[in-house]
């Protein structure tokens, strides 16, 4: 901005704000204590530095000049922050004039802006760093933040709107909200959307943009919770990759690594694309080893299913790398296979996943010599192949001859073990059948003895006909009791006798 005094007596001014011309006279001094002081001390040139430091747009300065001349001005969420700042630094307050711009701006802020969530966010999201600095100096940043925090705690879904704010406002807002018992789902969603908007966008190559992105990814790591499963594994891997690319601090990178290792079993093979080859065709093997080491050394011992999930994921990643990367070198494939085998050892019953990856790799690299093929198959454990995989491998012409011979040997061993198990089963079934025959013989012998015993009872009790089953009440006895054939004395007896009754004939 350029200021030109027309003459020392009139003190009329010609101002240029970012190339836009403004003509002012002493009317401005009547509304601004600062300008009055500068005029009296003949230091009007300092006004240029005041306005430049606030990065005032010509439209805002035009609004101020209109107020100084007594015209009506239109305040809005778009201009209220800048108007507040310029009114404060030009000392357009009650101390200088009863009808002042600062009082008018503060009233509008309280009644029209802070009462509305959307208007408050809108007022802040368009502020430059210089304006925010001035706003912080006068203590108005806290006023805006307190208003937003109060509303966000009542409805955490509003956190999605905050991603439009500058980082210096967004981070303290999320940190303060996270101290309360709020929905982690909405909080995490807001942080992830912020990263997608400000960090993961394609870099234009500008140094300042890269610096802002680096600060952004470091803030994202600080804001994300550590609870297992609250953040998708895909986002964590993507954030880790971006933190490495942007050269973020070690604490930032370590934070993402820890979160990934805590829920590695929830990741998918495609999430491991962070290991995708760089320009030189190499994979970040050490990073993968670091994450796996952290996962397996976790103090909270996971159940076996988590180990199984990680082992299968690594096998699937190895398969995808073999299928999609035509430039995958033998040495790199071998290192990835070694990691996958180490993860599946004593966890998976079969190593069919490793075999499938090797088969695909050999298919895509037909030009490999025999020694290179053997190198690719170095960590293939033929003894852990399923019978189906052995059958396929025994006919696989892509495999080295030595591997095929090992597979054939394993197949023979599997057949022998199968026959042995079947023979053992036959012997066990035969023994069971013998036991059943002996049991049946004992039952038949018992049945042969029972008739003699029953005959003896019939001889002793000629008058009683007993038809009974073992451990069951005589049906005939029940019939007699119901029809009054049993006296109290005969009820106590172990068997009852049928008393002969006289037959009476009635003659008419």
From Swiss-Prot:
Pathway listed: Protein modification; protein ubiquitination
Keyword Phosphoprotein: yes
Family membership noted in the UniProt record: Belongs to the NPH3 family.
Residue numbers of Phosphotyrosine PTMs: 355
Keyword Hydrolase appears in the UniProt entry: no
Domain statement: The BTB/POZ domain mediates the interaction with some component of ubiquitin ligase complexes.
GO process terms (BP): protein ubiquitination
Function: May act as a substrate-specific adapter of an E3 ubiquitin-protein ligase complex (CUL3-RBX1-BTB) which mediates the ubiquitination and subsequent proteasomal degradation of target proteins.
Residue ranges of every copy of the NPH3 domain listed in the record: 156-414
Signal peptide span: none
Domain of life: Eukaryota
Name of the protein described by the UniProt record: BTB/POZ domain-containing protein At3g03510
Domain called BTB: residue spans: 11-77
Keywords recorded for this protein, A-Z: Phosphoprotein, Ubl conjugation pathway
């Amino acid at each position: 901005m350029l200021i030109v005094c027309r003459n020392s007596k009139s003190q009329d001014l010609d101002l240029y704000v970012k190339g836009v011309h403004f003509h002012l006279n002493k009317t401005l001094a009547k509304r601004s204590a600062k300008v009055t002081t500068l005029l009296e001390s003949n230091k009007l040139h300092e006004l240029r530095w005041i306005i430049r430091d606030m990065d005032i747009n010509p439209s805002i300065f035009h609004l101020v000049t209109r107020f100084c001349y007594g015209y009506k001005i239109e305040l809005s969420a778009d201009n209220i922050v800048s108007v507040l700042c310029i009114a404060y630094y030009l000392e357009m307050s009650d101390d200088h004039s009863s009808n002042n711009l600062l009082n008018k701006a503060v009233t509008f802020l309280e009644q029209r802006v802070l009462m509305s969530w959307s208007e408050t966010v809108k007022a802040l999201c368009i502020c430059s760093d210089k304006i925010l600095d001035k706003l912080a100096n006068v203590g108005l940043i806290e006023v805006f933040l307190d208003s937003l925090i109060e509303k966000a705690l009542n409805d955490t879904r509003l956190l999605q709107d905050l991603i439009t704010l500058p980082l210096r406002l967004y981070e303290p807002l999320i940190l303060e909200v996270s101290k309360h018992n709020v929905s982690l789902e909405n909080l995490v969603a807001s942080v992830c959307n912020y990263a997608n908007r400000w960090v993961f966008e394609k870099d234009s190559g500008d140094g300042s943009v890269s610096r802002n992105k680096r600060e952004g990814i470091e803030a994202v790591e600080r804001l994300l919770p550590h609870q297992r499963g609250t953040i998708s594994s895909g986002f964590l891997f993507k954030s880790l990759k971006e933190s490495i690319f942007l050269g973020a601090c070690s604490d930032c990178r370590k934070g993402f690594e820890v979160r990934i290792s805590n829920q590695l079993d929830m990741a998918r093979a495609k999430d491991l694309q962070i290991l995708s080859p760089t320009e030189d065709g190499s994979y970040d093997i050490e990073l993968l080893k670091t994450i796996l080491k952290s996962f397996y050394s976790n103090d909270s011992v996971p159940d076996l299913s988590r180990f199984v999930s990680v082992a299968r994921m690594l096998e699937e990643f190895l398969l995808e790398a073999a299928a999609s990367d035509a430039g995958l070198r033998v040495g790199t494939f071998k290192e990835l296979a070694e990691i996958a085998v180490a993860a599946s050892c004593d966890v998976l019953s079969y190593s069919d996943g490793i075999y499938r990856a090797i088969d695909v790799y050999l298919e895509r690299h037909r030009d490999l010599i025999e020694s290179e093929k053997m190198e690719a198959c170095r960590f293939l454990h033929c003894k852990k192949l399923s019978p189906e995989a052995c059958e396929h491998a025994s006919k696989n012409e892509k495999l080295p001859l030595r591997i095929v011979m090992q597979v054939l040997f394993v197949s023979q061993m599997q057949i022998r073990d199968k026959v042995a198990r079947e023979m053992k089963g036959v012997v066990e079934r035969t023994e069971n059948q013998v036991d059943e025959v002996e049991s049946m013989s004992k039952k038949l012998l018992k049945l042969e003895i029972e008739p003699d015993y029953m005959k003896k009872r019939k001889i002793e009790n000629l008058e009683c006909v007993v038809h009974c089953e073992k451990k069951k009440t005589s049906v005939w006895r029940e019939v007699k009791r119901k029809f009054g054939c049993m006296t109290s004395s005969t009820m106590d007896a172990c068997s009852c006798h049928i008393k002969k009754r006289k037959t009476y004939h009635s003659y008419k």
